[in-house]
A protein has these predicted regions:
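Short glycine-enriched, charge-decorated loop/helix-capping segments at active-site entrances
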Residues: 66-67, 167-174, 246-251
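Proteins enriched for Cys/Gly/acidic motifs involved in redox and nucleic-acid/cofactor modification
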Residues: 1-101, 139, 154, 175-193, ...
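Terminal RNA-binding accessory module
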Residues: 246-323
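Conserved SAM/AdoMet-binding glycine-rich loop
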Residues: 86-212
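Conserved N-terminal phosphate-binding loop of PLP-dependent enzymes in the Aspartate aminotransferase
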Residues: 122-123, 227-228, 243-247, 251, ...
Length: 323
């Protein structure tokens, strides 16, 4: 038995990998899909619509751990959304491993799914937990921004703002395509004096071969072009069996730590700018049931947390507020 202190978290995964060397595991059952939804809160539910991934990004073991992309038919998902609505829940977050790849195993597609979910009575708001930029089509954006129940909240993996690193990661887009997608969403969604779109962006720092100059391409791309409301920052971690793990040009941990801090500082700056850009804007808030020291919280459509004095009359209700 090994015990790790709070400062030794980086040793946990290598230690586990060392212990399981030589242990064989079966992939039996990875072709199954087990639909599920959670309803721990009275206001929001997470509905799993997809599992697995067919992408083979050079740093990732998810396709091997979770199997190929798969899902159940839309005809079986709609009743789950209806059951959620019957519990009085008004917001659903769609989840999956590669959510936008929905339909590969049933001959359908993600656009088919969201259009049918939009018609479920009782559900007033939808969020997409994460979607690959190449799977978020202009046709889909046009529909989402036409007055549907889908909110102006996008979680999109970028991973790197440097084309050299994107190619070496095995990603399926370049920075020009990514920037064009972000700009298109803003053009279709935002009006003067109205809410700004929330973009949450995933970024990996310290991928093998990422020099200081290449990292700064990512930094400047985020700061000057994408300008997200939030950056989810992950230091690259070697995964046995992946092409990236075998590379000799690994980045030192101390360099990764420095780059993470730089992006955390940038994230704080960009998030503050996002909040200021929404100040004075009217938005709808769905209040949650939790009593936090006499206060209750809820989120606007563009994912700004709003607090007010606790009042059970507001639980599960959508009300307009001025930010």
């Amino acid at each position: 038995t090994e015990v790790f202190g709070a400062t030794e978290k980086s040793r946990i995964v290598p230690s586990i990998l060392e212990k399981v060397k030589g242990i064989e595991c079966s992939d039996k059952g990875l072709g199954n899909f087990f639909p599920a939804y959670s309803s721990g809160e009275r206001t929001r539910s997470f509905l799993k619509v997809q599992d697995g991934c067919d992408y083979k990004c050079h740093y990732c073991t998810v396709p091997y751990a979770r199997g190929e992309s798969r899902n159940i038919p839309i005809s079986e998902i709609i009743p789950q959304a209806e059951a959620i609505a019957a519990e009085g829940i008004k917001e659903i977050v769609l989840t999956g491993v590669n959510t936008g790849d929905f339909g590969r195993s049933t001959g359908e597609n993600f656009f088919d799914l969201i259009r049918q979910l939009n018609d479920v009575e009782g559900i007033e708001r939808y969020r997409i937990s994460s979607i690959e930029p190449n799977l978020l089509t202009e046709e889909m954006i046009d529909w989402i921004t036409s007055g549907t129940k889908f909110l102006p909240h996008y979680h999109i993996p970028l991973q790197s703002g440097c084309d050299t690193i994107l190619r070496e990661m095995g990603r399926r887009y370049d920075t020009a395509a990514f920037a064009s997608k972000i700009e298109y969403i803003r053009q279709k969604s935002e009006v003067p004096g109205g809410p700004k779109v929330f973009f949450g962006i995933d970024v990996i720092v310290g991928f093998p071969g990422e020099t200081d100059e290449l990292f700064m391409e990512t930094y400047n791309f985020l700061k000057d072009v994408v300008r997200p409301a939030f950056i989810h920052i992950f230091p690259y971690s070697r995964r046995a069996g992946t092409p990236a793990a075998e590379r000799k040009d690994q980045v030192q941990d101390c360099v990764k730590t420095k780059r993470v801090q730089m992006l955390e500082d940038l994230c704080a700056q960009l998030h503050q700018e996002f909040l200021e850009a929404n100040t004075g804007v009217e938005e709808s808030v769905l209040f949650e049931s939790t009593d936090r020291k006499g206060m209750m919280e809820g989120y606007t459509g563009n994912y700004i947390r709003i607090s007010r004095p606790y009042d059970p009359e507001f639980i599960g209700k959508i009300v307009n507020v001025t930010i």
